[in-house]
Design a protein with these regions (language model features):
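N-terminal beta-strand motif that seeds the catalytic metal site of vicinal oxygen chelate
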Residues: 1-14, 70, 74, 125-137
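Short glycine-enriched loop/turn motifs at secondary-structure junctions
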Residues: 1-2, 63-67, 104-105
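Core segments of cupin and vicinal oxygen chelate
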Residues: 9-52
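Short, conserved charged micro-motifs
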Residues: 15-16, 77-82
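Short beta-strand micro-motifs in enzyme catalytic cores
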Residues: 34-36, 68, 107-111
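A short local loop/turn or secondary-structure capping micro-motif enriched for an aromatic residue
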Residues: 46-47, 53-57, 129-132
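Helix-adjacent hinge/juxtasegments
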Residues: 59-75
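Vicinal oxygen chelate
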Residues: 83-84, 89-137
């Protein structure tokens, strides 16, 4: 089994614990005074106490996308449910849930938000999951 591992900087471990654990529903694994492991939908996400980094932006299908960012490709129902959960928690979207690449092989629902440390996350769902790596026609 191959799992993805990602380590990101956060400037407040308690805020990260609330965001990733309580809001996004990621179970917590090991931790210390300077880092916390989370089960990010079957992958290992580690938040390390560190200073904030700069965010840059790139254009994608008319949107200004924050870079760097990471996230998850979900099924459509799970994507909609997570969007509702984020709204219910009173968090602001950086980019509201919407569909991009409409009518193309890469059609997808997407939304972006920032964690409390300013890390950008994207959650998306492919209209046709088999087209995740399809080239645009």
């Amino acid at each position: 089994m191959n799992l993805f591992h990602l380590a990101i900087p956060v400037d407040d471990l308690a805020a990260a614990r609330e965001f990733y654990g309580a809001v996004l529903g990621c179970p917590e694994g090991r931790s210390s005074e300077t880092w916390i492991d989370f089960d990010f939908h079957g992958h290992q996400l580690v938040v390390h106490k560190a200073p904030r980094s700069a965010i840059h932006r790139n254009p994608v299908d008319g949107d200004s996308v924050p870079v760097p960012h990471f996230g998850l490709v979900m099924d459509w129902a799970g994507w909609e449910a997570l969007g509702a959960r984020i709204r219910q928690a009173g968090l602001a979207f950086e980019m509201e849930p919407h569909v991009r690449f409409a009518g193309k092989p890469g059609e997808q629902g997407t939304f972006f938000l920032f964690d409390p440390a300013g890390n950008a996350l994207e959650f998306k769902a492919m209209r046709n999951p088999g087209n995740l790596f399809a080239k645009q026609a």
